């Protein structure tokens, strides 16, 4: 063992060899290193290796001074916030990887590597550098897979580099998450790095010395695949599975998987994924004799360790090697549950795969595309994805079961392009950049405003899949303007006037139009310094270029045909060059084509910059600058054709120029078309907004337009049959009827002209909708299927607030933009702990969000519904459409009585919980809270409250959840166990309840407050507190004092509000505001009965109970307007919040949120949206009248 003494005289063990290590050395070598040493010394076949020790890691952290910086980043981190966790990890890893390795440690690693090379008889041995955490393989908490492994590392300096990367992998998002969850101090867990000779495996896999699925201790399970073991360990390859009887070594079961891909080393020593040869795809990887030989080694390993082991193995040149062994940490303790037999279950089997973790669970399907969507999964859901990774741990902990396939259908061909903030990039280029951690933005559509916007790309995926080749066509259906997309890819499409999600195959089958865009917004302005030279840049580059030497621009060449029509233009370009210090001289004249040149530095650098960045400049330039640039191209090599359109000609190989022109024209709201003449010439042409360009051209005059009689083509065409179905009730001289019936497109301007001549009820509303469409950035195009094949497809995931904004714009071969949604995609892994079925191949295709399924993790079966239910009939599959979300300024929340309905309530899309009733949680316990305190103690009541509140807070996180303290009347508590002593009141609704009772039973109130405090400390910062039935500010003051006693500072640590349920509270609302509150919630149920003196539970008078009584509404209006004046938020949580006609008034008065019952959320959201629109319209009308 190499021991270094530091400046303080402490002994530092930097390097340890396997013969120096045993299982007792986890604190020195980490789990992997200690285990390898144990196996080496037990005489097991292990490749030679050395370990860079945990002391070395600590030395590195100390000498580089990184500890304080890391602590600062981790301070206050909420690990349940996926974005925050990921960002913290990136910052820490960057700090570690960019730090300078201490020289003494660097030399120690190099010396050890050179010694390993001597042992292996190689000049530079190829090694694997594997992280080995000091808490990694402890039985209490599986840390496996949380740190990194690097294969095919060669050379001493590279080993040093990748050891440092291993150090940084101690702070991956999932490692940070696990340590927080398991209560490990981040700096008490150290990391070692194992540097081991890499076995170039012909076949490899894993072995479990106990069947981890059935937990049968008499069985040993081997998984095997072709090539390196990386595919099996990560789960990206479906392995063969062999089950061996440990007593007889009889092979009792085999599952021979179809193995599509394998990991191999290429000639450069790098790992790559290749296709398995056809004759090996379904061939058994290990022979029966090899299975038994490996099983014997496994038995020896288990015997040596004295416990069930999880072993990684490899096979090279006729010999097995053990790469790693660790205890199986996932075996359940205690009595096993009785397993259901497949034949006993009366349910339809939807899928079969390989059982990966035992157990049976029923729940709602939630399909996850990637780790950014893990918050979608709630407690008890069935997580369905292509493949899972340890990064999905937060979602897995909530899931009742997990179902995976080997890869769902991602979306777009690799050569298709998207427009990013770096210009046009192919999908396969974007994939590489994103996977390398590059930040990119992509053009997309805002589903609410129908305006284009830039969106951040947060992930990318790829695989192979079936692809449709679709062509964009207009009048001529024979199109070469194509793109390849998977048939189940979803597009935003108008169906019956609503923006909807429709699969490509359904679009084709039903001849639906899709959306294109006619405008690209600027990302940011940064080329104002080029404003004066944009025209010159376009003119020169239209048919010229910049000569470079060693990449630097040294001269400008400008080529033009010497015609009478171009003489003035050429002279003006010469004059413009002189203005920036250049001087064009003629250097050649062939067939009347003259080439001019200037070798001056400034024009060469300026025009050279424009040439290099021509494809991205339009993204960052103003419209005036872009118009000048394009005008230069038009004058230089363009014309105004007889078809009354402008044409620009470019060599088809000048891709950057073509793309710059395309982007520039869209930036100006001009829709360009691209056509190729033969293979060498590209023509970019357009015939709308011609004046924008022609008023800036110098050769082609604007007044030439007068020579053309043909009107400009109306480019914004829409499919009224899909977007404006209400037009079927209107017509103008048969035109609209024909357009609608035959699904023809019509120009928006022409449609406006027709409708202006129609005088009929309802037409004004349609005109308003058309106005919005005219101001939008969308129009309709038609597509058709022209071919089909199988090949690579790619997908990106964009950051968005809601699912309809998870879209982006993809471009065809001829640069026609089409709006598409994100599709299903994720990364692979196998996961433990909950019922899990892997290798189904088609889970993400067969299962749908919202389906109820039962997962049998041992049998590897997914059943339809609950296992006792059998569906008699299958519904005919139709085009499935989803309505776009309605966005409102007024929040629409939901009332929740019981934690059990939290998932259903959250699924409504509500903006939060406006009222979470404490009393229903208490009643659900079946025992009086006083009895719980007396018999079980304070902790029992706190835990019971936490459990209920947590379910709701978790389901809605990060949306707010407003918890109302206990408000149960005495008659409700009397029925509980221990409730015999509840006082008998003639009218409990006017009796001992609400804040009166809370302040009389402070010990129960404190339990509620302590439960909330602990939950907020767990990370549920979305919980708010509200007190009921207040009548005087003194009550608020007293509750605040009690909150401080339990460690909660109202209005500072936690949002704090009151229920306004009494006329007293409504009338003196300003006094409550002065006392200090964050929000008010109107409880109209009680407010109504107290205002009009009617007991709503009394059948004799309940018919007179009216929430819209003028006196009640007057009090409500007074509260809302008073609070608004003081900046206090208002909400309503009574039944009135579910009454549309009352909600209209609330919105008009300015209420901040409305909390409705679960079944009324959708209706109320529509009422709120309609009312908000009406309020805005009335304001506009009023303003207009006042101006007039």
From Swiss-Prot:
Catalytic center residues: 824, 1133
Claim: Kinase is one of the keywords in the record: yes
Signal sequence, start to end: none
E.C. no: 2.7.9.2
Residues binding substrate: 917, 964, 1061, 1083-1086
Required cofactor(s): Mg(2+)
PTM note: This protein undergoes a protein self splicing that involves a post-translational excision of the intervening region (intein) followed by peptide ligation.
SUPFAM superfamilies: Glutathione synthetase ATP-binding domain-like, Hedgehog/intein (Hint) domain, Homing endonucleases, Phosphoenolpyruvate/pyruvate domain, Phosphohistidine domain
GO function terms (MF aspect): ATP binding; endonuclease activity; metal ion binding; pyruvate, water dikinase activity
Record keywords, A-Z: ATP-binding, Autocatalytic cleavage, Kinase, Magnesium, Metal-binding, Nucleotide-binding, Phosphoprotein, Protein splicing, Transferase
GO biological process: gluconeogenesis; intein-mediated protein splicing
Cross-referenced InterPro entries: ATP_grasp_subdomain_1, Hint_dom_N, Hint_dom_sf, Homing_endonucl, Intein_C, Intein_endonuc_central, Intein_N, LAGLIDADG_dom
Comment text on domains: The N-terminal domain contains the ATP/Pi binding site, the central domain the pyrophosphate/phosphate carrier histidine, and the C-terminal domain the pyruvate binding site.
Family, as annotated: Belongs to the PEP-utilizing enzyme family.
Function comment: Catalyzes the phosphorylation of pyruvate to phosphoenolpyruvate.
Anything else known: The reaction takes place in three steps, mediated by a phosphocarrier histidine residue located on the surface of the central domain. The two first partial reactions are catalyzed at an active site located on the N-terminal domain, and the third partial reaction is catalyzed at an active site located on the C-terminal domain. For catalytic turnover, the central domain swivels from the concave surface of the N-terminal domain to that of the C-terminal domain.
Protein's name according to its UniProt entry: Probable phosphoenolpyruvate synthase
Organism ancestry: Archaea, Methanobacteriati, Methanobacteriota, Methanomada group, Methanococci
